[in-house]
């Protein structure tokens, strides 16, 4: 019976694929559980059912997903809200189709167990990514006159272990897990979301031009992607197996234990309120706060329009 159902599924998918719109999708990083919903949507045939022939192409470390959208390599991408807002401000107008992370995953991983609150960061040497993604921590530093000495890194683990810094920025679904898996036990861990600096991060984006030209196609891709994430939420073990397939295909150095832990954190950060089903919508209040603070500190030259960024759907 299972073989018959599998055969029927393949026949249906083949029929859909024959008339499908070809699409290239690029997540903002290498294969990992952060993008499990998109992998699941492809593997379970949700894109095919929507009449979409989707290829997933991961970016190179030195060439991000927004660049792939700009040069036409990709039709749909994921990126963080801050990067989408700054790109829009610089002339690359993006439209948010799905908001998959409602809270910031930024954390401060500290050596000293006495670093328990914001004021304890004053005058400390703290690592941050050379590639960026540190706008809000920098704003926090300025707004509270902490006088943090920022030290740029490529890999936070080595500089942290060396003792050259007092703490490092990291992601709760990534660096925090990697530190633990490497046997590094921090003295303390502070979440920016608990320090008054919470905001949405990952979302699904498309160029405004593509959105206006293909509104129905964009709707189908977003709905199929959401269906993929909903399946992942209810089938976590199987979802990690799918993630590991992409990990192996793209030769990413990780393991199933890291990806299991990562998936749990990613799914929790999708919830507007802990324990409730995700809305997958961009919260207007959080957006306007981010808009204001980024404008105030020079990361935007003008306010980003919420209705335009969300394609007028909110």
Regions found by a protein language model. Give the residues of each.
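Pocket-lining segment of extracytoplasmic ligand-binding domains
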Residues: 82-83, 155-252
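N-terminal hydrophobic or amphipathic helices and topogenic motifs
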Residues: 19-51, 284-314
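Short, surface-exposed acidic
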Residues: 147-150, 187-189, 249-264, 301-308
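Sec-dependent N-terminal signal peptides
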Residues: 4-16
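Secondary-structure end/capping motifs
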Residues: 214-297
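Short, glycine-/small- and polar/acidic-enriched structural segments
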Residues: 21-153, 157-170, 192, 198
């Amino acid at each position: 019976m299972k073989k018959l159902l599998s055969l029927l599924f393949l026949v249906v998918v083949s029929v859909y694929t024959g008339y499908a719109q070809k699409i290239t999708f690029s997540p903002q990083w290498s294969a990992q559980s952060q993008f499990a919903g998109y992998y699941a949507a492809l593997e379970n045939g949700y894109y095919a059912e929507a009449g979409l022939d989707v290829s997933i192409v991961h970016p190179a470390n030195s060439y991000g997903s927004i660049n792939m959208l700009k040069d036409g390599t990709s039709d749909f991408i994921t990126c963080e809200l801050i990067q989408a807002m700054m790109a829009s401000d610089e002339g690359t107008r993006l439209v948010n189709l799905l908001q998959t992370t409602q809270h910031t995953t930024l954390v401060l991983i500290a050596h000293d167990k006495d670093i328990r609150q914001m004021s304890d960061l004053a005058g400390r040497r703290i690592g941050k990514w050379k590639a960026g993604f540190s706008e809000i921590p920098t704003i926090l530093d300025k707004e509270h006159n902490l006088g943090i000495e920022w030290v740029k890194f490529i890999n936070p683990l080595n500089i942290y272990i060396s003792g050259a810094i007092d703490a490092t920025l990291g992601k709760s679904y990534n660096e925090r897990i990697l530190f633990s898996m490497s046997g590094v036990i921090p003295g303390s861990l502070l979440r920016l979301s608990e320090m008054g600096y919470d905001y949405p991060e990952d979302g699904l984006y498309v160029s405004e031009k593509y959105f206006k030209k293909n509104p129905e196609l964009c709707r189908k891709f977003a709905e199929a992607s959401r269906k993929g994430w909903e399946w992942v939420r209810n089938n976590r073990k199987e979802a990690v197996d799918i993630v590991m397939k992409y990990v192996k295909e793209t030769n990413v150095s990780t393991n199933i234990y890291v990806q299991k832990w990562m998936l749990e954190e990613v799914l929790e950060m999708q919830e507007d309120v802990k324990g409730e089903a995700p809305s997958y919508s961009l919260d207007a209040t959080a957006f306007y706060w981010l808009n204001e603070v980024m404008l105030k500190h020079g990361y935007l030259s003008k306010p980003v329009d919420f209705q335009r960024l969300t394609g007028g759907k909110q």
